[in-house]
């Protein structure tokens, strides 16, 4: 029985960042782990990992501990270690270009300026990495982007984001259970 899918949530390690916009990927992996009964309790290749079964498929859940912009330094060695092709990795991350409350699955493509995703693309040597984007919206006029993504969600945004994080975990589970990317995009993109 081989690992068929790696689910990577992007974020920054430590309690200081736990509820920030940039940690939406970590939040989804935590929800997915709870839903699947998987404990992320092993550190390997600079990442917190957990393995489990979904149907007959083994899956690897990953939270890189390298800080966002160096995520590829954890993901690429894990993919090589477990023999997982880039196309079998689902990267979950925040997206400034999607409004809060929006969700978008893509098969691959450019990083769209997301440095954590760009690090993964660079280290894997391909843009053919599926991803699940969580909309966080753009900062208000005059606010620095870095300050914005490293701050916790506002109360108003949290009301929009919480249901989307749950929906993102459902989308990831759908794929882990063997659902097609086309069907997942039709069902979950909004």
Curated annotation (Swiss-Prot):
Protein keywords: Cytoplasm, Hydrolase, RNA-binding, tRNA-binding
Binding locations of tRNA: 17, 67, 69
EC number, UniProt record: 3.1.1.29
Site (Discriminates between blocked and unblocked aminoacyl-tRNA): 12
Enzymatic reactions: an N-acyl-L-alpha-aminoacyl-tRNA + H2O = an N-acyl-L-amino acid + a tRNA + H(+)
InterPro entries attached to this UniProt entry: Pept_tRNA_hydro, Pept_tRNA_hydro_CS, Pept_tRNA_hydro_sf
Keyword tRNA-binding among record annotations: yes
Active-site annotation: 22 (proton acceptor)
GO biological process: protein quality control for misfolded or incompletely synthesized proteins; rescue of stalled ribosome
Pfam name, any one: Pept_tRNA_hydro
CDD domains linked: PTH
Quaternary state and interactors: Monomer.
PANTHER family: PEPTIDYL-TRNA HYDROLASE
UniProt function note: Hydrolyzes ribosome-free peptidyl-tRNAs (with 1 or more amino acids incorporated), which drop off the ribosome during protein synthesis, or as a result of ribosome stalling.
Site (described: Stabilizes the basic form of H active site to accept a proton): 94
Enzyme class: hydrolase
Superkingdom of the organism of origin: Bacteria
Principal location: cytoplasm
Protein name as catalogued: Peptidyl-tRNA hydrolase
Cellular location(s): Cytoplasm
GO MF term list: peptidyl-tRNA hydrolase activity; tRNA binding
Family: Belongs to the PTH family.
A GO cellular component annotation in the UniProt record: cytoplasm
